[in-house]
Amino acid sequence: MTMCSGARLALLVYGIIMHSSVYCSPAAAGLRFPGIRPEDEAYDEDGNPLQDFYDSDPPGVGGPASTLRDAYALYYPAEERDVAHGILNKAYRKVLDQLSARKYLQTLMAKSVGGNLDGGAEDDSEPLSKRHSDGIFTDSYSRYRKQMAVKKYLAAVLGKRYKQRVKNKGRRIAYL
């Protein structure tokens, strides 16, 4: 369980980092902060950035998806992406293996406890609860029967002892 939660936590942290770095970065979203100016941009006298006509595509050629893809490729080279995807795939496979193993063990336990080999999904919970309540009743009843047998035995033994004492007129005889 600890390993599974650790893998889930690693997967969650990795997903949050990748999401925030790709989709929430100012360059990918096209946001500009007025107090922060990149040093390689040119500005006019009003402080507005000048458009770079040599590096940019004409308007309408590239959509937002291509811009996002270009920004992703710029910030994360292919080698780093492959390593990150490999780590993610390894952690994801480990989590899936643990989940499938847990599910397999649960089905084995349900079959061994329930004795149901045809694997009906709706019949799994009913026999287990019925068997559980039957077991509780049987256990309580057998405990009650044992207590009654002990009381009956003690009453018989102590009754005989009392009768023997009366018969022997006070002489003590050890019976137990």
Swiss-Prot record:
It is found in: Secreted. One of its GO terms (biological process) is positive regulation of transcription by RNA polymerase II. It comes from the Eukaryota. The modification Leucine amide is found at residue 158. One of its GO terms (molecular function) is neuropeptide hormone activity. Residues 150-158 are annotated as: Important for receptor binding. PROSITE patterns: GLUCAGON. GO terms for cellular component: extracellular region; neuron projection; perikaryon. Keywords: Amidation, Cleavage on pair of basic residues, Hormone, Neurogenesis, Secreted, Signal. The keyword Secreted applies. InterPro entries: Glucagon_GIP_secretin_VIP, VIP/GHRH-like. Residues 1-24 form the signal peptide. It holds the Pfam family Hormone_2. Belongs to the glucagon family. PACAP is a neuropeptide involved in diverse array of physiological processes through activating the PACAP subfamily of class B1 G protein-coupled receptors: VIP receptor 1 (VIPR1), VIP receptor 2 (VIPR2), and PACAP type I receptor (ADCYAP1R1). Exerts neuroprotective and general cytoprotective effects due to anti-apoptotic, anti-inflammatory, and antioxidant actions. Promotes neuron projection development through the RAPGEF2/Rap1/B-Raf/ERK pathway. In chromaffin cells, induces long-lasting increase of intracellular calcium concentrations and neuroendocrine secretion. This is Pituitary adenylate cyclase-activating polypeptide. The lineage of its organism: Eukaryota, Metazoa, Chordata, Craniata, Vertebrata.
